[in-house]
């Protein structure tokens, strides 16, 4: 459900012009913030930290609703449970988790830039320098390292003191540099909020593209049904047995439908209809189709003419994504 509107995705030629490929996709939320990215190019660098799907959905809904108070979208590493807080200017502090237990410190989480192997190297050095007595690594899926000290040497230590001693605090500064949503230019954002708000305004503009296409597709079908009705009304069923060949049938269809816009495939489709399709009950089906398509086009046009309705539909689809995500968690 993250990706919508596959039939209106802008296309471009591939490197040799042999096929068309997507210029970009149309996700409901700004996926550039989901997994994070780090990179360097000539004159530019980017460092985008990952976020949770839930937070991105909530931020997108807030932007759709034009809320002045925007939710915090703190970095989130799904494989870590460390504490995170913003410290201003797109900088964040990550803090590991520990428990002080008698003469031991139990480490339950590391900051994102500190791997288990690097931390164990650090502990080995601290053990060599007699800063700690020893340590036991009981980590499996989750981090669990018991760092042992001499009896009484850490009496009164707080978790904060233990974190500082073991250097389980790190900082990262985000630099949000991305290709714009159409994939044409490099753009730098001063904040995650600005990026999300900008994305939402870009994404909602494609709802107009969606409904223009829906109207065009429905109109194409309506024209064919109206042409079929005219063929009934203008005596094409009676003409068919007299026609010498298919070319005469096509010529007759063109005469009857001269004032209706249909293309050659639609003309061929009319000419190829089996005889039972010219019965009275089939004619009634055509009348029903015309009425239904006309009503559908009217509904689509009402949505296209009202930006608030298109925004509301966008909101409904993001809300449905939120519901699905909550079920799958």
Regions found by a protein language model. Name each.
Residues 2-30:
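Conserved mixed alpha/beta core segments that line enzyme active sites in large multi-domain catalysts
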Residues 4-5, 24, 31, 35-329:
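C-terminal interaction appendages of subunits in large macromolecular complexes
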């Amino acid at each position: 459900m993250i990706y919508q509107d596959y039939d209106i995705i802008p296309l471009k030629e591939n490197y040799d012009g042999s096929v068309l490929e997507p210029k970009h996709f149309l996700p409901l939320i700004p996926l550039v913030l989901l997994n994070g990215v780090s990179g360097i190019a000539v004159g530019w660098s980017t460092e985008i930290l990952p976020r949770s799907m839930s937070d991105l959905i909530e931020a997108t809904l807030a932007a759709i609703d034009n809320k002045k108070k925007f939710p915090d979208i703190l970095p989130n590493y799904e494989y870590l449970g460390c504490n995170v807080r913003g410290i201003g200017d797109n900088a964040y502090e990550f803090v590991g988790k520990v428990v002080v237990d008698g003469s031991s410190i139990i480490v339950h989480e590391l900051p994102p830039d500190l791997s288990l192997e690097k931390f164990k190297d650090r502990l080995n050095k601290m053990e060599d320098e007699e800063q700690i007595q020893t340590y036991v690594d009981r980590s499996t899926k989750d981090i669990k390292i018991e760092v042992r000290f001499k009896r009484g040497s850490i009496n009164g230590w707080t978790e904060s003191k233990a974190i500082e001693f073991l250097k389980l605090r790190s900082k990262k500064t985000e630099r949000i540099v991305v290709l714009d949503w159409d994939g044409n230019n490099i753009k730098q954002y001063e904040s995650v909020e600005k990026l999300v708000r900008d994305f939402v305004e870009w994404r909602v503009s494609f709802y107009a593209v969606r409904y223009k296409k829906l109207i065009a597709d429905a109109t194409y079908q309506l024209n064919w049904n109206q042409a079929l009705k005219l063929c009934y009304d203008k005596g094409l069923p009676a003409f068919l047995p007299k026609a010498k060949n298919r070319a005469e049938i096509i010529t007759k269809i063109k005469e009857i439908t001269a004032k209706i816009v249909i293309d050659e495939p639609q003309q061929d489709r009319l000419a190829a209809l089996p005889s039972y399709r010219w019965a009275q009950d089939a004619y009634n089906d055509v009348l029903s189709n015309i009425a239904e398509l006309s009503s559908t086009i009217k509904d689509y046009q009402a949505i296209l003419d009202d930006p608030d309705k298109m925004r509301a539909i966008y909101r409904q689809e993001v809300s449905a994504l939120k519901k699905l995500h909550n079920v799958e968690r």
